[in-house]
Amino acid sequence: MLPADNGYYFLCSGHIYFWNGDVTKQAVPLCSRPNCSHTTEDCAAMIRDASQKMYKVDDGFYVLSIWPREDSKTGEKMMPIWRVQNDGSGKEIVGEIPDASVVNYTVFQDKIYYTMEDIRTDGNYQFSVWQMSLDGKEKKQIWQGDLYSGYISTLQGIGEWLYVSESGCEEAIDWTNEDNIDFEKLPTRTNLYLYQPQSEEWITNPDEYKKEDVLLSIQNIYQNEIYLTYYDSKAEIRKVWKKGFDLEDEAQFVGEFPRKAYKWDNLYGYTWPDRNDEDENWFEIYDYDGNLVQKIDLYPHDDIDIISADEKYAFVYWIQAQDGVGQEVIGVIERDKIATHEAELIQLTKGMNGNSFER
């Protein structure tokens, strides 16, 4: 979710949208072509199989498509990175990265960073991080992971540092004996790496982040503070800490939550489906003291995720069935309606069916 002077830009269902901040209006695809149906690839707003992340640099948006294209010279499958003009007048491919089953990417300090999944002959895989220029002409490997068969949960620029969080096994797994592997007893760990592009300095597991055993993720960034989620497997609870952007800033404990918690002004919220009643799904909002402020009914939607929040809105993502096909949807919850218990989920996008965007 990218704020602008006159509204917000966001990526949903393979399209870039603009929303002017009026809850009585829907978001519209970022395309200035007259009479465009926004359903074909010549639409400026449409990026086929777009990843869920979008970045703005100068007058353009950078979006990775995970739909691979075959290189006419080498035959190698490559995933294109598109640059879309911020007025919706056009788009172009500025770079490509090799096709991979799992990929993370980000744009930070005028460089593109992405992960590569390196498959070994013994069936294990490891991750590496690569840096690419914005025009796609220069690229180099800057990091090689030392864990096996895991995942990268964070690749994100924050302040002056690029954050890389990797989880995996400390030793190669014998996949030839897979039926007898006790996965719970494998020596696994999570490492946090910080990279400073100017000095090309790497820091591994800085002390400021060693607050709990397992760092799940950098949950969200809110007003120059980083919210970190750790998991206590014994208590089956998530513990949240916060710290400033400066590396030396001491982290402070926020609280314990049963599910992913999202910082929102002076409140915290998380989705909470009722597992005893499949017809119930809620977004619960609490104050600093743990008091319930409002419980917003999200049914019939499920698998809802809060993707961003500012002083006015929380932006919500979910999958909605339409004509037998799952459609990605974005909605908002108004911050100022919570005090009066009038907040509700407002849908901003519809499916890509012909004229569904007409007013």
Give the ranges of each region predicted by the language model:
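Repeated scaffold domains used in trafficking and secretory/extracellular systems
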Residues: 1-4, 40-57, 99-109, 147-159, ...
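Short loop/turn segments that connect beta-strands within the blades of beta-propeller domains
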Residues: 4, 12-13, 23, 57-58, ...
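Surface-exposed loop/turn elements that mediate protein-protein interactions on large endomembrane-trafficking
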Residues: 15-42, 70-97, 120-145, 173-211, ...
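Residue position within the beta-strands of beta-propeller blades
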Residues: 10-11, 62-65, 113-116, 163-166, ...
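Extracytoplasmic/periplasmic C-terminal soluble domains
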Residues: 113, 141-158, 163, 167-168
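Intrinsically disordered, low-complexity prosegments and terminal tails associated
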Residues: 49, 53, 68-69, 166-171, ...
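N-terminal leader/targeting helix
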Residues: 215-220, 226-232, 237-238
